[in-house]
Structure formats: structure tokens, C-alpha cells
């Protein structure tokens, strides 16, 4: 078959690796920062949860349908090209969504200093206590772009002078801001000058601005950094059109972009399966993670240093979508050489139905499905609101991107120890260890105290994400019938994990609104620990039936060169069955 250029396997693998690398960079441009951008627009936490939950739900239901259509009508190349091209255009629609305050501009791009574009929600009334400071004011937190100490030492004495100085500072520190009925309004019902205590008090200051990380609900000492006062408010009373338009754009965008990965994976798998080389595509996920790691740091650095130069007006973060569109165009060029099998007329496949039937008939798979569901619910809360939490503590986008890259690189570096870890601890042991590390990780997120404090715990992602999914994959391979491993894996990652992500987003937004982000992560920790205890108590009581994977046995038999050995010790079938028994016993 080598003369046929359609089956050039080395070339196909090189193109597939490059495609996964570019797609990883593409996803990293927007996916980690989407909820942070929605916060910049003024969308409240529960609405962000609804939006992200809808996004996950669409992906869960829409991807299998598109994959079926692409295979049934042999239109995979069309799906790949159409998804990349249309999603590149759809991403730019997000730039057109207006913020809650239509007068919002990039106020931090004033040439000399940076001031937050995300500020108080519409109609928030707050009492402000200003304490004089020495020098030019408290310094900014390292890496922070949205906190700034307010220097009141230059304000004149007297009530009228104090209010005038306050108004001049708040308006003047935001270069080019407009003081209109939709912009900044300072309404005072009382002003007191306490010169003996050195404190100026402004009563009932109403700031009609956008939601952000300024502490609400009580007196605030503005001589301190913003993140040190109270829990930020995550509600918004602005126009619902921002949410409605954002929801419409995200739904449309997801319908176009979601099928890409599944259609590409199916195409490559069938291409390699025709020449019995499917085992050679198992390292492609490494290239995807490398792309995400590089992309998330690159886009964060780009936003931090070039956005003021490239985007003068509009909310902070629009460059995410321009970058996504640009990288999608690059991926479109690579996709023209992506391996797609042709003239493979096959009958209808019912592997999804068979996979559901297999799960329903095996209690161990049912338990594993619930485990993956809770993993998805927890992961979505981290994806949706961890960057909010970091932003409230002064983290910049570069620190956020580095935290994501650190966790992904840890998974890649830890992968060579996969086999030894699964052999020493067994699949059940690694699952329990992964759930415990995930619970510890989200509990740590609830108590972060500084802009850098989230970085050390990211090393736990090697276990809470990497090893946990290795154990899930190994369990699926051992519990599935021959030829059903891939269908089961797709169902677990697509349906059960996606459904958990959807539920976590829906519930997480309302928990953040009423209790705060820290309470959300504490609740996730409690749920994971309860499920871990239930999992470890139920697992030993389930029937431990041995299911021989004949494809694995044949692979072992083909590589066994000791057929001439005497006795059962030289029998490859006996060796495989003993290893299978020892794994389940462990």
C-alpha cells in the first residue's frame, strides 16, 4: 500500500501533530479567559454560569450528532474546513457585544498609569472612608492591573474642598472618561471633615459604573489595595441586552466550533486503523497540551503589553478574539493536508447505543460514570471562576496564563510514570488519589491570599487531572468489550464529563452570587470528599468479573519471543491472565 499516497502514515502523523499544536494555541486564546471577558462586559456571575452551562450542554449534544453526519455522508473534510472558517468569523461577533455601560473605554490605556475598566455595578451605594497616606500612596500589588491605592494627602481641608478633590481624583485618574448620567455620578448626602483624626468621610457616595472587584456593602478604607477589603460583589443591575447578545454569540459560536475536534479525531483514527497503526496516535494529546501551554502564556503577554497599542477603545480583552480568529486561519491552512480517509463505504454504526447498553449492564461502569460527572462539575467551577478569584487578589493575565501552563506541563512531564503508577496503586487506588488531590486543590483555591499564591498548588494537577484521567482510561479499556474502548471513552469524556461541566456552571454562578467564590470551592471540596468516601465503600462490593481483552492478548502474543519455553511460565496467555488477575486484586 505504500505506493498509494493516501496511506502515507509518517506524513499523516506529522500533519496531525502540527494540527493539534495549532488547535491547542487556538483554544488557549479564548477558552481560559472567556468568563473574565464577560466580567469586563458587566455580566453578573449567575448569568455567566448560565451562559457557560449552555455552552457545555450544546457541546455535549451537538458533537455526537455532527460526528455522525460527517461519517455517514463522508463530509469530514467539509466539516473541518467549515468549522474552522466559520468559527473564526463567529469569534469576532463577540467584539461587537456592548458592555453594560456603553460609555466604557479602555481607561487603563492612558499612557502613564493603568486604572481598572471594571468598577462598581450600576446603582451601588457605598460609604467611603478616605485616610491620608504618606508620600504618593500605597504601591500597587505586583502583577496587578486593576487595583490602585487612593492618595488623599493632597486634598484641601474643608467639606467643599474635600468633595472637589475627591471628584477631581476619581474623574481625572481615568483619562478621557465622560461624566454623564450614564457614566460617573457622585451624589453625596453628607460630608464630614474630621481633621483631628485625619480622616475625611463621604457619606452615601453613589457610583453608577460597571461591576468589578471593588468591595461593596460597607465602609472601605481606600488607602489600602482593593483586594484587601471585602469580598467583591458579582451582581449586576445593568441592561439585560449584554447577556442576551453574549448568549446568542456564544451559542452560535459553539455550534460552529464544537464538532472540529471530534471529527478530526475520528478521521485520523479511521485513517490509521486501515493500516493497523492506531496505537501510533496515542501521543497526540501531548501536542495539544503543548499548544495550549504556549498559547495561554502568549496571549496573556500580548494582552498585557500590546492591547493599548492595538485596541484603543472597547473593553479590556477584545484581543483574545482577534487572536483566535488569526490562529483559526492558520489551522485552516494546516487542515488542507490533514489525513481524511476516502471511499470508505461502511454500514451504519450503532456503537453509541452499544456503549450505553454496556454501561447500563455493568455496575462498575455506572460508578465510574458518576465519578466522571462529579469531576466535570468541579472542573467547570474552576474554569469559570478561578480567574475571577485571582483577579480579585491582584493577579494579572500573565500570572493566570502561567498557572494554566504550569498545570499542563506537569501532566506532560509526569506521563512517563503512568504505567508504573497504575501498576503499583491499581486503577481504583489512582482514582481515589486523584479525587483526593482534586478536593485538596479546590480547597486551596478557596484560601488564596495573594496574586501568586495559586501557582504552587498547580503541581497537584499532575495527579488531580493527569493521573485521574489515566485511571479512568485504563478502567474503560479493561471493562469494555473488544472494539468498544474508543466509543466508551468518547461517551465518558463527551456525555458524562460534559453534563457535569454544564451542571457545575449552572449551579456555580448562583453560589458565587449569594455566597462568594471561596464558598463555592469549599462546597466543591466537600462534595468530592463525600463522593470519594462513597466510591471507596461501594467499589469493593461490586462484582469483580474478569473480562479478557483479546486484542491486548494478541498484541502480547505477537511480541513474545519465548514460544519455545517449557511450562506455563512461558505461555503468554497464562502471563496475561495472571497480570489481569493481579491488577483487579490490587
Swiss-Prot record:
Pfam families: MFS_1_like (PF12832). Coiled coil: none annotated. Residues 223-237 have a biased composition (Polar residues). It comes from the Eukaryota. Disulfide bonds: none annotated. The chain crosses the membrane at residues 50-70, 78-98, 240-260, 284-304, 318-338, 365-385, 397-417, 428-448, 454-474, 494-514, 519-538. CDD domains: MFS_MFSD6L. Residues 218-237 are annotated as: Disordered. Gene3D superfamilies: MFS general substrate transporter like domains. It is a multi-pass membrane protein. It is found in: Membrane. Keywords: Membrane, Transmembrane, Transmembrane helix. InterPro entries: MFS_assoc_dom, MFS_MFSD6, MFS_trans_sf. Belongs to the major facilitator superfamily. MFSD6 family. This is Major facilitator superfamily domain-containing protein 6-like. It comes from Mus musculus (Mouse). The gene is Mfsd6l.
